[in-house]
């Protein structure tokens, strides 16, 4: 099992965000997290990705207890195992597309030729190789989202976490992005976890997990 969450709870002061969450996710699965605003979808993604810590509970990735990792070992683990796609892109406006993609490997000690090769390979897969020398003011919203996906893939992660990845896109580009994530999960055996309210996203997910009132209330298989 790629991801195991055991009795995971998160509280802010006296407010319970979620409690005693138990969940297993396999490689190659697309998992959709749904729920009302403030239900804990983004918080759960952030905890899996190491941006926040749970109040209680355990997280295992590839049978490794990741909450026990410290310092450099912890940073290296998250950098290599997990790629993020954020709602607001978080791309550097002064850098070229190729440089934005390569930012994910800043601390990987890769040679420049290896970095260039990886960027070109990923960009070709995502059909953005023709814009690698462009600045961000020259790309569309759909292309910007593909750049984010390319950056998330740069370190060859086992997991991609996507927080509302289609919110800033028109319906056509939104569906194209989800199709790409679906294909990546299948072909690369990457677990893709998406938080979204979109019914369209649900149609591409293997599992739909609803978070409500601090708990997982429904887990349904859709494929």
Regions found by a protein language model. Give the residues of each.
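Conserved structural motif at the start of ABC-family nucleotide-binding domains
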Residues: 3, 18-20, 77
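Catalytic Walker B motif of ABC-type/P-loop ATPase nucleotide-binding domains
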Residues: 160-163
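Short coil-to-helix segment of the ABC ATPase nucleotide-binding domain corresponding to the Q-loop/switch region
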Residues: 95-104
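Helix-to-loop junction immediately C-terminal to a conserved catalytic motif
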Residues: 49
């Amino acid at each position: 099992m790629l991801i195991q969450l055991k009795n995971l709870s998160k509280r802010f002061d006296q407010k319970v965000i979620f409690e005693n969450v138990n969940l297993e996710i396999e490689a190659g699965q697309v998992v959709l997290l749904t729920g009302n605003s403030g239900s804990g979808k983004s918080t759960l993604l952030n905890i899996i990705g190491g941006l926040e810590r749970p109040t209680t509970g355990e997280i295992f990735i590839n049978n490794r207890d990741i909450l026990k990792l410290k310092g450099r070992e912890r940073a290296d683990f998250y950098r290599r195992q997990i790629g993020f796609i954020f709602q607001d892109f978080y791309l550097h406006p002064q850098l070229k597309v190729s440089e934005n993609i390569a930012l994910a490997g800043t601390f990987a000690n890769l040679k420049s030729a290896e970095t260039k090769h990886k960027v070109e390979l990923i960009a070709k897969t995502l059909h953005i190789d023709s814009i690698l020398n462009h600045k961000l003011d020259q790309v569309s919203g759909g292309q910007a989202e593909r750049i984010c996906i390319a950056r998330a893939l740069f370190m060859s992660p086992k997991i991609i976490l996507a927080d509302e990845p289609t919110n800033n896109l028109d319906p056509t580009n939104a569906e194209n992005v989800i199709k790409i994530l679906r294909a990546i999960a299948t072909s690369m055996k990457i677990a893709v976890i998406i938080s979204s309210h979109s019914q369209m996203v649900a149609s591409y997910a293997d599992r739909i997990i609803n978070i409500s009132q601090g708990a997982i209330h429904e887990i349904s298989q859709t494929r």
